[in-house]
Amino acid sequence: MVIAKLAGVALAALLLCPGPAMAQSAPADAASAAEIRAKVAAMAARMGKGTFAYEPLVKDGETIAALEYWKAPGKPAVHPDEAEYALVIEGAGTLVSGGTMVEPAETRPGLVEGSRIDGGSTRRLGPGDVILVPAGVPHWFGIEGKLVLLGMKLPRK
């Protein structure tokens, strides 16, 4: 009987004591600031006279954070089912967002491009700025020399 009581007390003590912390899953991928700088330099070297380069940086399954290197503006765009989140890494430019896309045409699944945006809002962009363009909102990047973004698409909920 004494052994049973001691075993019960020991079990209760074990249940009340905090156990070791459960291991947290590590990120699927990571990139240091030095690695990002090296990738941006490599992208610039590979581009030559090109005006746009895209390179995935980190990913977890289908979710990808990628570097976008712009030397010249592209066409205004709309991602009907995805928001676009980005951090300016280098360079400068402008973001025009909102308004109405003129002459919209689906150029590939998930991307509608047009000739211009009427009535959008303009915002200057520089290193450290963060943007979030909601799904379905027209947007366009003006480029001043170069604009390097770290961005990802976020599915519409």
What residue spans do the PLM features occupy?
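Short, conserved beta-strand element in jelly-roll/cupin
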Residues: 80-101, 107-116
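Short hydrophobic/aromatic-rich beta-strand segments that constitute the beta-sheet cores
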Residues: 67, 95-97, 149-151
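N-terminal secretory signal peptides that target proteins for export/translocation
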Residues: 1-4
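A short, N-terminal "cap"/entry segment at the start of jelly-roll beta-barrel domains
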Residues: 20-80
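His/acidic/aromatic-lined binding-pocket segments of jelly-roll/cupin-type domains
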Residues: 77, 84-87, 122-123, 131
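Bacterial N-terminal signal peptides
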Residues: 7-19
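Short acidic-glycine-tyrosine-enriched beta hairpin
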Residues: 107-135
